[in-house]
């Protein structure tokens, strides 16, 4: 499912506009990485796309639907999001946490039906987290925990997955594994995956597209043409 942005402005209604007049199409079946200076508004854009924060102006189209026409439940069946903040859910097992991804279909406290259990199992298998299914969340490494959070998003069965700095807190090998996993899911499961990152080198190697966010908008960039100044600011 494509994401189409028409003259989108993001920011705060009673505060500054972070970026304005964004016009771009983010294609399905691809891993797209969002880059830009610290504090430029990458998280704001992701929150706006997910519906957690209202837009300032313009339009967001998710496939053939304008986002404003969607109910919260409809949107939760189109977009799943993995945030930077690590949830304090140490008492839950991996299976229980991934099962929470089914809440758009069961309700937050709903019991998992056979179809839901199948979605949980498939998500754990696809992400390589199946061996962790009976572990407590607080026993996991940062890399394992991120894999489980991606599995929860996958269990939500949405065509679009947004991730805010998914490689933060991870060691180098886990960062590689995480981006490779997301690339594979985008290509093999036809997911539209958009993530923010400061890890420009890995993003340039593994992403299908880099998008540079600035106050002037959002534009695709060729990693080979990014100036050293931009590279330094993004990676600091």
Which role does the model predict for each range below?
Residues 213-236:
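Conserved beta-strand-loop-alpha-helix hinge in the C-terminal portion
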Residues 58-66, 75:
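Conserved ABC transporter NBD signature motif
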